[in-house]
Amino acid sequence: MRIILITGISGSGKSVALNALEDAGYYCVDNLPPRFLPQLASYLAEDGQDRLAVAIDARSSASLDEMPAMIRDLSRAHDVRVLFLNASTQSLIQRFSETRRRHPLSGSTSHDADVGLLNSLAEAIERERELVAGLAEFGHQIDTSNLRANVLRAWVKRFIEQKDSGLVLMFESFGFKRGVPLDADFVFDVRTLPNPYYDHELRPLTGLDKPVIDFLDALPVVHEMIDDIEKFLAKWLPHFRDDNRSYLTVAIGCTGGQHRSVFIAETLAARLAASANVIVRHRDAPVEAGESSKLVA
């Protein structure tokens, strides 16, 4: 059975991700106490189910301490993948304010003696970060701070389409003006390269469009940058693989995240596709098609 565990910070989009998995045919359970996960997996496997998705939050803090060992045990019999959703505190506060929802650890809703009474929203968010921090290393992290719901659904679809084993290498383009992705393991700044933005014909395009590709591909300095990043990753990827890392996110940043970073992320992904299971995502470029422009909430 393939088991997808969705965890992370409340308000970061776990419900959106779970709905996407339900649409993909997964048996979905929201806010399951972690201690019941092994029994649920066994029951569904006996019942013929081959895909399970479970969303877990920080309300059962005692059980969260047992999750790393539980994940290792489940992985012996099942294909277990962990999706860890994160977002900046500022984004989360704005989302809770807009939806008028109460954070699960704030005020009177927190009954866990280990958690205590958390009056401010910011305090509840930071406490939750501490409680779930141990799960982040087991999963593929996605920063949803500036992400729209339809884009998150598309990224979840790509996540579950990956091969069953091996290192997943994520190339993520972004714009520094919207902040560095929280999920990045490595960040490469390519703002020193010539910017197609200053060509009025190229400005509305992205690094996926042929005129922008031709512009950047003709510059030796661009290829020097790509070659250097590729050599660095080719050298160190085996070490991460030997360390049993399942996911590695390489963030490529330019000013707006539309031209240079997109082109370089795509080029690196093509070059390293034989070395790992590669995913590409473009956080800030308008290249993800979808029916909704609503931000993750």
Swiss-Prot record:
ATP binds at G8, I9, S10, G11, S12, G13, K14, S15. InterPro entries: P-loop_NTPase, RapZ-like, RapZ-like_N, RapZ_C. It holds the Pfam family PapZ_C. Keywords: ATP-binding, GTP-binding, Nucleotide-binding. The keyword Disulfide bond does not apply. HAMAP family: RapZ_like. This is Nucleotide-binding protein Bxeno_A0336.
